[in-house]
Amino acid sequence: MRRALWAFGALLIVTAVIGVIFSARPRFLLLVFVGIGLSVIALYGAFWFRGSRWSNLCITALVTGLCLSVLDPLVIATMPKPIISDEGSWSRKYHFVGDSDLGFALPTGVVGEAREVTAGRVIYDVMYTIDANGHRRTDTSSDPGTDNVLFMGDSFTFGVGLNDNETLPELFSEDTNRHYNVVNFGVAAYGLHQVVRALELGRPDPFLAQGKSYIVYTAIPDHARRAVSAYTWAVQGPAYRLGPDGVALYHGKLHSAAAGMVISTLSRSAFLAKYLLPGLLENPDMDAYSLYAGLAKRARQVAEEKYHATFIMLFWDFNVQAEPEVKAAFDAAGVAYIPVSRIIPDLLAQPQTYHIAPPIDMHPTAAANRLIAAYLAKRLLDGTIGQ
C-alpha cells in the first residue's frame, strides 16, 4: 500500500510539472504545482519514516513545499490587474508556430478572430487572414514583371487590431492601384534581428516578382531590447554582435534550445518570472542601442547587396521609453530613417486618432496607416523615396 502511495505521489508531481510546462494554461502557477507535489511526497515520507531522523527531513520538505505553493498566488495577488485582455480564436488557437531560424512565425492558411477588451469595453474585434505562405493577406499585382514592395517588421507592420483591409501594406497596395507586388512579412513581437536574418536567409526570394525591390521596415524603440533577448518570448531568435565596422554580424541563436526550455518553464511561475528571470535575461555586456543601430546598417547592407533593393526605415517616434537612446544611437551610427512624425505632423498632439487605444495600446490605427501609405505611394511613384 505504501509503495502505491509513493508511486501515486511521484506521478502527481511529474504530471503537474509536465502539465504546466507543455499546456497553455494554467499560466504563472508553476510553483503551486511543484510545491503541492513536493508536499505530497514529503507527507508520504514523513509517515513512511516516522520515528527516524529521516522523518524530520521529510517534514522540512513538507513545509518547504507548502511555502513554494503560495509564492505564485501571493505575487499574482499583489500584481496590478491586467488593463487589457486578449480574446478570440487568434489568441486561443493560432498566434505563433515555432521557426528554427527566427524563433517563431505565423501559422499558415488560417483565419482567426482577435478581440481586445478593457474594463468591459471592446477596443477592437477584428479578423486576421493568414495566407498559405504565412503572410497577412494583402491584395497585390499579378504581373510577374512588376516591382516589389516588401513590408517587414512586427505587429505595426502585421496590423494588430486591424482588419485585413486596414493594414499598412494593404492600404499602400490600394493607393498604388495594385501596381506593385506587395507582401506583408510582419509578425507580432518580431525585432529587427529577425528581419535581418530573414533577409540573409533569402526568405523573401520565393515571393519576388522580376522587377526591382523596395524593403520597408517599420521600427519602434522596443526593437533594441528584443535584439538582446530582454523578453521571455524572444529567447529563441537569432543573435547578433557588433562587428569592428559597427555592422551587426550573425552570432548563432540567442539561447540554446535547452536554455530556451528552461527560461520558458521558469516563466510559468509568477514569482520566478518577476524575481529570477530578469537577471537571467539581462546581458550587461551588450549595448542594445548600438546593436540596434548595427542591425539597421546590416539590414540596409543585405537589402542592397543581396536584393539590389532600396531599404526604407520608418521610425515611430511617438514619445515612448528608450526613444531618445535609440535616436542617439542611430544618429551616432549615421543610420538613415524616416520619422513617422514627419509624415504625420500632429502624431503626438492627436494620439487618439493615430493609436488604437492610447496609452494602453499604441498600435497604429487605420487612419495612421492611410497617411503613411499615401506618403510611401507618392514617394515611390515619383521616384523620391530613396532621397
Task: Specify the residue positions occupied by each region the protein language model found.
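Membrane/wall-proximal cationic-aromatic binding patches
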Residues: 78-175, 344-350, 355-359
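Membrane-interface junctions at the ends of membrane-embedded or membrane-associated helices
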Residues: 1-5, 42-54, 381-387
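Short, amphipathic alpha-helical "lid/cap" segments that border enzyme active or binding sites
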Residues: 192, 196, 289, 293, ...
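Serine-dependent acyl-ester chemistry module
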Residues: 9-20, 24-25, 220-354, 358-362
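Conserved SGNH/GDSL esterase-like catalytic core that processes O-acyl groups on lipids
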Residues: 158-243
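Histidine-centered active-site loop/cap adjacent to the catalytic His
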Residues: 3-4, 358-387
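Internal/C-terminal transmembrane anchor helices
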Residues: 52-78
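Membrane-embedded alpha-helical segments of integral membrane proteins
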Residues: 3-46
